[in-house]
Amino acid sequence: MKLEPQIMAIVIGTTDISLIPGISVAGASPELTHYTPALDVEYLLLGMPKTMEVIPVTPEGIPTPALVTRAVAGEVAKLVVNAGSRITPKVPYVDLGGEPGRDFRRGPALSCEAARNILERGRALGCELGRLGCIYIGESIPGGTTTAMAILVAMGYDAWGRTSSASPNNPKELKIAVVKEGLRRVSAPLKPLEAVCEMGDPVHLAVAAIALGVSECGGVPVLAGGTQMAAAAALYKGLGGDLAKLHVATTRWIAEDKSADFMGLMEIVGVKNVYIAGVSFAGSKYEGLRAYERGAVKEGVAMGGALFYALSKGKDVLRLVEAEYERLLSAGVAGNVN
């Protein structure tokens, strides 16, 4: 199916879950994960990061998936949506009146007021975007695969150990232990908003709310992401969304990730419209890109949707991505792996 985006909305936010050592590699250190969403969208829109002088990289120096999104879908209009980021980006953005997510082991992740703001304003934004047609919705939230698992489990889904990781070595045992500790405070299963407030983060709710608004106002929502989008889809469904109108586009690296279960999660939530972008970086001359074939990064910042779109247009994806990576390496802002 040809799903051509009119706008690509990138929802950013942070969760203190990403500060737990070993749980997220979406940043060079746990502390730097709070800068990743802002840096991702600054680079995506401007071509260079602003808040710091380097694009987000893993601890091994593997570049952000925003590199791929910018390289292959640069002509698609982007809209940054701040659901609750600890660091606000130095680019224009829509603010949903949310807040950064807290560590759900210690107490509720979000206030009820922030969650209501995100739902109401995200839905209204989605409705306006939906009038334009097909809208891709991506995300940037380090720690998001853990909070996605937490949301799904809190809502009664069997998602234990089934979400992916930006690391080749998915820290599933750590994630499960963290989620179990948080669940001791609540009586699952919870209703959608309760699950987000207690065990979630601002981003998954915002993605669901925007998708809901898009579908309600005649548009076509495409969740551009991996296993995290199972949580967004579950919230969308739980809030009254029609799953027949929802689409999910992700990467081959997510679909083939044996440490997770992307298709299984889509199945238990009930998502039928799933698209896999079959791209390989195995032939790249750059180690930082070949690392994607060994399980690094996999998804994020709408990369799966961007690749799906680029392939539908017949683009030479690897050539475009290598050219952009070369530009960043020359500028000295692409980390320490080439």
UniProtKB/Swiss-Prot annotation:
In its UniProt record, a GO molecular function of this protein is: nicotinate-nucleotide-dimethylbenzimidazole phosphoribosyltransferase activity
Top-level taxon of the source organism = Archaea
Q: Which InterPro entries does its entry note?
A: Nict_dMeBzImd_PRibTrfase, Nict_dMeBzImd_PRibTrfase_arc, Nict_dMeBzImd_PRibTrfase_sf
Q: NCBIfam families, alphabetically?
A: nicotinate mononucleotide-dependent phosphoribosyltransferase CobT, PRK04447.1-1, PRK04447.1-5
Write out the similarity annotation. Belongs to the UPF0284 family.
Q: PANTHER family given for it?
A: PTHR38811, UPF0284 PROTEIN SLL1500
Q: What is this protein called?
A: UPF0284 protein PAE0372
Species of origin reads Pyrobaculum aerophilum (strain ATCC 51768 / DSM 7523 / JCM 9630 / CIP 104966 / NBRC 100827 / IM2)
